[in-house]
Amino acid sequence: MAIEQTAITRATFDEVILPIYAPAEFIPVKGQGSRIWDQQGKEYVDFAGGIAVTALGHCHPALVNALKTQGETLWHISNVFTNEPALRLGRKLIEATFAERVVFMNSGTEANETAFKLARHYACVRHSPFKTKIIAFHNAFHGRSLFTVSVGGQPKYSDGFGPKPADIIHVPFNDLHAVKAVMDDHTCAVVVEPIQGEGGVTAATPEFLQGLRELCDQHQALLVFDEVQCGMGRTGDLFAYMHYGVTPDILTSAKALGGGFPVSAMLTTAEIASAFHPGSHGSTYGGNPLACAVAGAAFDIINTPEVLEGIQAKRQHFVDHLQKIDQQYDVFSDIRGMGLLIGAELKPQYKGRARDFLYAGAEEGVMVLNAGPDVMRFAPSLVVEDADIDEGMHRFAHAVAKVVGA
């Protein structure tokens, strides 16, 4: 039966898409830099960045060129073969980090799934089949597959799907004593976000991460850093572990890695990687030439002094605006995070209303995020212009006034 061609509107979403999202009422159709336009031509300043993904803004010329060039050359061949863009990107990541081996996937979930499987398998073949315990943290977020959502410490995402993978223990974030209480020689891995993004934009303390490193060494467990949201320049270092001076055994990256093109990576050492062999894990699309070509172009720009050394000044620009808004409207109890991953916690009288501020922002022409019901989150382009920060925060101030005055 022929399908009648009708206009695409927000109502179309409710008619055809699985109801796992509740998207905004407007549909973005064009982006350039830190600005977005919807179907009606309304302009928005983008401080959401596709949830910390569009690290170089929308339609960056270098990324567009990389995509067009690769798109005219080779799209897909699977991992029955390798390809030049994947090998180039792998070499760049290894040369810039602690890692000696890398594997590419398509999403943060897949990178974390790979990391958790590797940690379990490494413990099994190198130590004992009973060394299976994974220690993770309350309010963590590691993905949506059954394994990764179970390692994530938020029951609202993991309950209701039947039996969960076993031997996963959650303890409070930044509480080293709680980790010590459950850590033993049956532990195969400790999994942690250096900055909890979805969990409220809460940064780990240096003492906490250093303590985790020492405990993992003591119990022959692997330290896994999930840098899906906080990595690729967002903190002002290429990866957050560099800021802390604590080197993990396994690191995962996604989001900003592709600048908007779906791609992820898991990085580790040669010795740990050797626990896997052909067939241990895999992906049809992982390491896709299109994705890796775009990611390589993004990497070449992000991993430069011009970008990384400008992050802190841009952060301060945001913080200055947030402090002025707070002085005027008395709305934030804390402004936190690191680099251009910024959280603004709402005061008690506004608890649970983060989405009200988000929706008001959209009405005023600025796109922001929430991190739970009580925290506003900002994850803009790493090269956002000062004029965009000023204009976007001016609009956000109007949004705050609207909510506070409601």
From Swiss-Prot:
Gene Ontology BP terms: L-arginine biosynthetic process; lysine biosynthetic process via diaminopimelate
TM segment ranges: none
Cofactor note: Binds 1 pyridoxal phosphate per subunit.
Domain of life of the native organism: Bacteria
Localisation: Cytoplasm
Residues binding N(2)-acetyl-L-ornithine, per UniProt: R144, S283
GO molecular function: identical protein binding; N2-acetyl-L-ornithine:2-oxoglutarate 5-aminotransferase activity; pyridoxal phosphate binding; succinyldiaminopimelate transaminase activity
Extra remark beyond the main annotation: The reaction catalyzed by ACOAT is highly reversible. This enzyme may also transaminate ornithine.
Annotated protein name in UniProt: Acetylornithine/succinyldiaminopimelate aminotransferase
Organism: Escherichia coli O6:H1 (strain CFT073 / ATCC 700928 / UPEC)
Top-level taxonomy: Bacteria, Pseudomonadati, Pseudomonadota, Gammaproteobacteria, Enterobacterales
